């Protein structure tokens, strides 16, 4: 005769079934919206708003608008496919309290929170993950308040650079801000990673002009510079804001610009002096008048049915055409610049020109308010830094390699000027003493895995080819040119070592200070992504559970059972 087991034990079949029950996807119990409902209730409680008023800001996968909201700020079509893992929820906050609630509720549900402002993360780390996650889309927090009297502006994280330039233009023709040339880039990512543009040699980095900031920390608190302290303020002005919290906005100092500036573009090919021009550029671009920024574009092309390389100098001079022509006739005769190559215009119009609007003086300024949503192509970017000029034979071999590969191009951005005057630890960005930065760039339109593989391989092959010509120990990279090829972090037992691989490339010796700050402000590593700053382990070496999972403790007949409940369903 069978006897009943003591109540302090659980039979094996029942124990197994109990664990299985707890670990089954919640959709199996017709609760596919449970995560959304739990988040919505939490969000409503934290914001003290009725749920009916916030449903336009919290989107589940079943919401008809979910796909369009997700796609709007995906700027790389490689991550806009049916096989790409989708977020469980997208939050589009419209206030500081919304952001605070989003952080608190995501933390409560133990979901990874990806933070997206403009969506220009080249490898998509602000909106993709291989683990269950939410997206906090900052695009609605876009206010730009310009105060010419104090030469300053408060810029929200979700504003675009085009909107910033337009709002400055509304108030003044002789003020500007030293930031990027792509108008749809979001301020939150651009400034938190350092930020640079075509006035970098005159004024330095964008973050050199940040006077204050607001951030939501891991506890949901809204902190300004005084409240967060100088360490955290330093970290979010070049060290990537998403590792420490959610940046709400920055107060920046505006810079003076002339009423008239000059732009020009000059092209040469291999049979017309391109090698000599590129070689000489290395000794002129980083050392000439700081008012002059000359970007070098190098691209394999077919000309007259012959494969060749085109080298183009695209430039901004903060002054008149006569001045820059006279300057470069002495310093850079290989360029062959003539006055007819130049166009004079306002600084704002030059921003339009750099956005490939060649009729910039005739374009409606409001074009910079257009966010060009859901218009991405496929692409890959990588970066390098050069500390010593590449020899002429190196340029020749580079051109041959680019012709062999077929499509991938290079962009050389000169430093020097103001950049060379600022200490490498003034901000987390450590590359100020380099001659120039290289961007590897390839775009394509075909939605094909095989074609994508080929272009990604081109980027890797050219990157490998350049090893002998670029920085070493570490081989440096620019944080805002996100590149997962240089290392990723799964935030497991080896999190620090994994983070150090890419962290040293991005931040050099500043990485150590960033890790200490991260550990102090977010010891549980809630704010994380595949290339975030890691934390130092606590004394017990404790690790968090995987994102998207929560620990549930149950007692069955006196025995304690620990189970993991999967909260995300696909």
Swiss-Prot record:
Residues 1-30 form the signal peptide. Residues 83-257 form the FAD-binding PCMH-type domain. InterPro entries: BBE, FAD-bd_PCMH, FAD-bd_PCMH-like_sf, FAD-bd_PCMH_sub1, FAD-bd_PCMH_sub2, Oxid_FAD_bind_N. Its EC number is 1.1.1.-, 1.21.-.-. Keywords: Cell wall, Disulfide bond, FAD, Flavoprotein, Glycoprotein, Nucleotide-binding, Oxidoreductase, Secreted, Signal. It is found in: Secreted; Secreted, Cell wall. GO terms for biological process: defense response to fungus; response to oxidative stress. The FAD cofactor is bound via a bicovalent 6-S-cysteinyl, 8alpha-N1-histidyl FAD linkage. There is a cross-link at residues 120-182 (6-(S-cysteinyl)-8alpha-(pros-histidyl)-FAD (His-Cys)). It comes from the Eukaryota. The keyword Glycoprotein applies. It is an enzyme of class 1 (oxidoreductase). Binds 1 FAD per subunit in a bicovalent manner. GO terms for molecular function: FAD binding; oxidoreductase activity, acting on the CH-OH group of donors, oxygen as acceptor. Pfam families: BBE, FAD_binding_4. Belongs to the oxygen-dependent FAD-linked oxidoreductase family. This is Berberine bridge enzyme-like 19. It comes from Arabidopsis thaliana (Mouse-ear cress).
């Amino acid at each position: 005769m069978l006897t009943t087991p003591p109540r302090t034990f659980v039979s094996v079949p029942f124990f197994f079934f109990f664990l299985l029950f707890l670990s089954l996807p919640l959709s199996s119990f017709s609760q596919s919206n449970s995560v959304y409902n739990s988040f919505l209730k939490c969000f409503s409680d934290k914001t003290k708003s009725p749920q009916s008023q916030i449903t336009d800001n919290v989107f589940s996968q079943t919401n008809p608008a979910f796909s369009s909201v997700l796609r709007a700020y995906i700027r790389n079509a490689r991550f806009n496919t049916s096989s790409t893992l989708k977020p469980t929820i997208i939050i589009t906050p419209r206030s500081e309290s919304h952001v605070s609630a989003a952080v608190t509720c995501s933390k409560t549900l133990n979901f990874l929170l990806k933070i997206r402002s403009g969506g220009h993360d080249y490898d998509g780390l602000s909106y993709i993950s291989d683990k269950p996650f939410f997206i906090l889309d900052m695009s609605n927090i876009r206010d730009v308040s310009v105060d010419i009297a104090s030469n300053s502006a408060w810029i929200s994280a979700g504003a675009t650079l085009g909107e910033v330039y337009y709002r400055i233009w509304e108030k003044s023709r002789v003020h500007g801000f030293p930031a990027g040339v792509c108008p749809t880039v979001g301020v939150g990512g651009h400034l938190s990673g350092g930020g640079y543009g075509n006035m970098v040699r005159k004024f330095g980095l964008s973050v050199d002009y940040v006077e204050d900031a607001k951030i939501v920390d891991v506890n949901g608190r809204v902190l300004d510079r005084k409240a967060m302290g100088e360490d955290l303020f330093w970290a979010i002005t070049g060290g990537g804001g998403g590792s420490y919290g959610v940046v709400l906005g920055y107060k920046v100092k505006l810079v003076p610009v002339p009423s008239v500036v000059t732009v020009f573009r000059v092209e040469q090919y291999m049979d017309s002096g391109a090698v000599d021009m590129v070689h000489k550029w290395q000794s002129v671009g980083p050392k000439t008048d700081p008012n002059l920024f000359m970007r070098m574009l190098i691209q394999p092309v077919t000309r007259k049915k012959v494969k060749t390389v085109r080298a183009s100098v695209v430039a901004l001079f903060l002054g008149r055409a006569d001045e820059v022509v006279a300057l470069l006739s002495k310093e850079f005769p290989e360029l062959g610049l003539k006055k007819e190559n130049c166009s004079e215009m306002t600084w704002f119009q030059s921003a339009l020109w750099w956005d490939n609007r060649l009729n910039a003086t005739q374009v409606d300024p409001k074009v910079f308010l257009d966010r060009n949503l859901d218009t991405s192509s496929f692409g890959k970017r990588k970066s390098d830094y050069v500390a010593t000029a590449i020899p002429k034979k190196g340029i020749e071999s580079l051109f041959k390699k680019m012709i062999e590969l077929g499509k991938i191009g290079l962009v050389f951005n000169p430093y020097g000027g103001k950049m060379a005057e600022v200490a490498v630890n003034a901000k987390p960005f450590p590359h100020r003493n380099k001659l120039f930065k290289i961007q590897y760039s390839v775009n394509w339109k075909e939605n094909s895995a095989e074609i994508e593989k080929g272009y990604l391989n081109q980027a890797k092959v050219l990157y490998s080819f350049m090893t002998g010509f670029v920085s070493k120990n570490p081989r440096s990279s620019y944080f805002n040119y996100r590149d997962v090829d240089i290392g990723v972090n799964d935030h497991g037992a080896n999190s620090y070592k994994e983070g150090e691989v890419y962290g040293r490339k991005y931040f050099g010796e500043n990485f150590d200070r960033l890790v200490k700050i991260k550990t102090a402000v977010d010891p549980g590593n809630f704010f994380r992504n595949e290339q975030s700053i890691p934390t130092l382990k606590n004394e017990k070496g404790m690790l968090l559970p995987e994102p998207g999972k929560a620990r549930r403790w149950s007692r069955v007949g006196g025995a304690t059972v620990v189970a993991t409940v999967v909260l995300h369903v696909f």
